[in-house]
C-alpha cells in the first residue's frame, strides 16, 4: 500500500487498496486511514454502484438526500450532473454535507464518472486544525454552545440543474448541534459549523452570534487548513 499526502493539513491519495473488496478487514484499513488523513482519494477504481453501496454500509446506516431524487435502483446514490451551459456549481460554497440532519454523517463517498477537461476540483478543510488554532477568546465563547443548522441552504439548489430531479419537497429541516464536537473515534475536538447551513448560535444574541460565526467562517477558509483534489474518471 502506498500513501501520498495531498497537503500538510489533510488528504491522502491511496494506492494498493481495492474498493471492490467490501470485507471487514479491508474496511478497517480504509477507516483507519480516514481517521488519520480526514479525506482519502483512490484513483482508477472502476467500482459498480452495488460495490459502492457495500463499502458505504460499513460506515453506518445509508441516507437519502431530502430534496433531490437518488437513482431508482440505488436511491441512496445522488447523481451530481451539470450540463455545459449551466453556471451554478453544486456545493459551490464551503459546507459540511447535510449538517442539518439530526445526526452528523460520518462519511460521504464521491465517485467520478465523467469530469470536465478543466476545473471541477474539490477542496476540503480540516476542522480539527481549525479548532486547535482558534483564538482562546472565541473558544471560550463557543465551547459549550449549540448552533442551529438549516436545510434551506440546500433547498436553494433544488431544480437548479435540469438533469437533477427534485422530489417535490421544499420543507425546511433544522437541528441543533454542538459548535465544538468531540469526534467519537479519535477523541479530537472539531468545529461543527459551516457557512451554508449554520444559521445561529443558541444562547447568544443575534448580533453576537452573527459576528462570531462570520469570524469562524473566515478562519475555516484558511488555505493552510485545506487540500485541493483534481478529479479523474473513476
Q: Where do the PLM segments sit?
A:
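Non-heme Fe(II) oxygenase catalytic core, chiefly the N-lobe of the double-stranded beta-helix
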Residues: 1-233
Amino acid at each position: 500500500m502506498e500513501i501520498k499526502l495531498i497537503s500538510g493539513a489533510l488528504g491522502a491519495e491511496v494506492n494498493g487498496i481495492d474498493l471492490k473488496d467490501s470485507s471487514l478487514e479491508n474496511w478497517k484499513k480504509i477507516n483507519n486511514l480516514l481517521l488519520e488523513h480526514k479525506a482519502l482519494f483512490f484513483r482508477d477504481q472502476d467500482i459498480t454502484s452495488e460495490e459502492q453501496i457495500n463499502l458505504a454500509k460499513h460506515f453506518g446506516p445509508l441516507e437519502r438526500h431530502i430534496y433531490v431524487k437518488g437513482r431508482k435502483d440505488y436511491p441512496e446514490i445522488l447523481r451530481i450532473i451539470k450540463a455545459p451551459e449551466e453556471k451554478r456549481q453544486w456545493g459551490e460554497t464551503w459546507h459540511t454535507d447535510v449538517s442539518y440532519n439530526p445526526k452528523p454523517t460520518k462519511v460521504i463517498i464521491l465517485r467520478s464518472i465523467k469530469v470536465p477537461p478543466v476545473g471541477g476540483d474539490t477542496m476540503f478543510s480540516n476542522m480539527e486544525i481549525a479548532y486547535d488554532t482558534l483564538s482562546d477568546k472565541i473558544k471560550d465563547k463557543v465551547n459549550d454552545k449549540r448552533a442551529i443548522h438549516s436545510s434551506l441552504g440546500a433547498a436553494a439548489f433544488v431544480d437548479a440543474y435540469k438533469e437533477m430531479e427534485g422530489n417535490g419537497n421544499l420543507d425546511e429541516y433544522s437541528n441543533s448541534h454542538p459548535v465544538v464536537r468531540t469526534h467519537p473515534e479519535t477523541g479530537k475536538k472539531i468545529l461543527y459549523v459551516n457557512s451554508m447551513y449554520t444559521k445561529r448560535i443558541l444562547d447568544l444574541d443575534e448580533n453576537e452570534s452573527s459576528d462570531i460565526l462570520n469570524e469562524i467562517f473566515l478562519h475555516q477558509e484558511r488555505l493552510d487548513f485545506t487540500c485541493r483534489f483534481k478529479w479523474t474518471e473513476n
